[in-house]
Each structure stands twice: as C-alpha cells, then as structure tokens.
Regions:
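A short beta-strand motif characteristic of beta-propeller blades
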Residues: 9-16, 51-58, 100-107, 146-153, ...
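Beta-rich, blade/repeat-based domains predominating
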Residues: 18-32, 59-75, 105-123, 153-170, ...
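Conserved beta-strand positions in repeat-built beta-propeller and related beta-rich domains
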Residues: 33-38, 76-87, 125-130, 171-176, ...
Length: 263
C-alpha cells in the first residue's frame, strides 16, 4: 500500500496495491506510474483501473523495483535490487521515456536508490549496500561517459538511501541506520545535517506551498525493542521547514498518451 497526505488539512488516505511498492510518480489527476515488484504499472489510483503494465526483470525471480525519480524532461528513471538484500550485484538502473521505451543504463548494483538529477545529463545515484553515492554523466543516447564516487559513507554514517536536490543543487541524503538527513554541496562537503528521532531514514523530498518543506520518511525494518525504545518515532513521516527551496519534481511525461489510448 501507499499513503497520500493533504498538508493543508492533514488528511491521510491509504491506497492498496497487490504487490510490494518501491515508488510512484504522478502523470495527471489520479493517474500514477507505480514501481512494483516485477512491474511498472500505470494506474488510476482512485478507480483502481490498471491502464498499462510493463513487466520488469521477470527472469530474475528475487529482484524487485526499488526507488525511482523523473529527470528534467519528465523521463522516468528507476532501479532494481535483490529482494533478500544479499550482497549480490543483480540490480540495474533503467530509463522509461514518454513513448514507454525501456533502456537499461547501468548494472551491477546491490541496492539502488535515487537518482537525483542535476540537469539532463548529470545525476547522483546510490548503491546503499556499498555505502556509495555515484555522480554519473550520460550522453544524449543515455550512454554513461563518466561514473565517479561522489561520497562513500562510513559505518557510523549508516547507508545512503533516497535523496533530492535543492535550488542550489545541494544534495539532501537520507541515512538508513544513521538517524539523519545530510546536505552536501557539489564538492561533497557536508554543509548541514538534520538529526531525527528515527533510526532508519529512507527518503526525503521537498513539497509544501513554497516547496521549502522537506518531507522525510523512515522505517522500522530490522529494529529490535531496544532500538525502538531509543528511536520511538521510527516509521514516522517528518516535515522540516527550510529557508531553501527544492527543485520541483517533474511529472512523468506521457504527453502522447491520449493519441495512444493510454489515458
């Protein structure tokens, strides 16, 4: 399942799906694209009508889709991972364009998270299991021309998880098993840290009326009683007001969808 939250009246709504969900991206009105286990699904979440299903990695039984984001043109980028979180490099990074063409851009990941786009050709992407944030450059044909380690986390930092960018192109990174969100500038220098009363921080995104409110998700996965006592708000959604605005996330671009009888 997944939830929506109206920040004006604090109303929460639950939506049920029949598979484990990694991410969702908005297309229009009640129509979203969902990243599910083994499947990308375009669905009207209000009526529950499934409009289109795209099967992903059916030949790798224990893999699932994890995180996903849109780029500045509205293309969808998402990654896969081993569902048992074994230290095997079966995860890949994919791009889905407005015509629903699927391209495998990168491979040999354990746990994919992100990406976060600086511009059309440059983005950050994470392998959480390896504790590495990469900085990747691609050409117009989506071929990687540069892939460098941007930041390597230490054991005490936890693992880099989901991330987002602000208007100044600083990267905000959730720390799984690290109880914080860190902000790094383009030179990987730590410029700010938000400590949180939850151990496993999973993702962060800017929203709110002025796009200056950071929404932060967390999880209780793998925590014992002592951990839950120490971090009693684990599993909660947090919001933090900032004096910096985030980059507006693009909707998934399916502008030819009407002609193709998709929407």
């Amino acid at each position: 399942c997944f939830f929506s939250l109206n920040v004006k009246n604090n109303k929460k709504k639950k939506y049920k799906v029949n598979k484990e969900i990694g991410f969702l991206a908005h297309i229009k009105k009640n129509i979203f694209i969902l990243g599910l286990k083994g499947e990308l699904r375009i669905q009207n979440v209000k009526t529950k009508k499934i409009i289109k299903s795209i099967l992903i990695e059916q030949d790798i039984k224990l893999n699932r889709i994890n995180d996903g984001k849109t780029d500045p043109k509205g293309n969808l980028w998402f990654g896969t991972m081993d569902n048992l979180e074994r230290k095997i490099e079966k995860g890949s990074l994919y791009k889905l364009d407005k015509n629903l063409n699927l391209t495998k851009v990168d491979k040999n990941y354990r746990i994919t998270n992100g990406p976060a786009f600086i511009n059309e050709n440059n983005f950050y992407h994470t392998d959480s299991s390896k504790k590495i944030i990469y900085k990747i450059k691609i050409n117009k044909k989506d071929k990687i021309i540069s892939k460098k380690i941007f930041k390597k986390f230490s054991k005490k930092d936890g693992s880099p998880d989901g991330m987002t960018l602000d208007k100044n192109k600083n990267i905000w990174v959730a720390h799984f098993h690290g109880a914080c969100v860190s902000v790094f500038n383009k030179n990987a220098k730590l410029i700010h840290k938000i400590n949180l009363p939850a151990q496993n921080i999973t993702n962060c995104a800017f929203g709110g009326q002025n796009n200056n409110e950071l929404f932060i998700t967390s999880a209780t996965k793998g925590m014992n009683r002592a951990d839950l006592k120490k971090f009693k708000y684990s599993g909660s959604l947090f919001s933090v007001k900032s004096n910096i605005r985030g980059i507006q996330q693009k909707k998934f671009n399916l502008k030819d969808a009407k002609k193709r009888s998709l929407l």
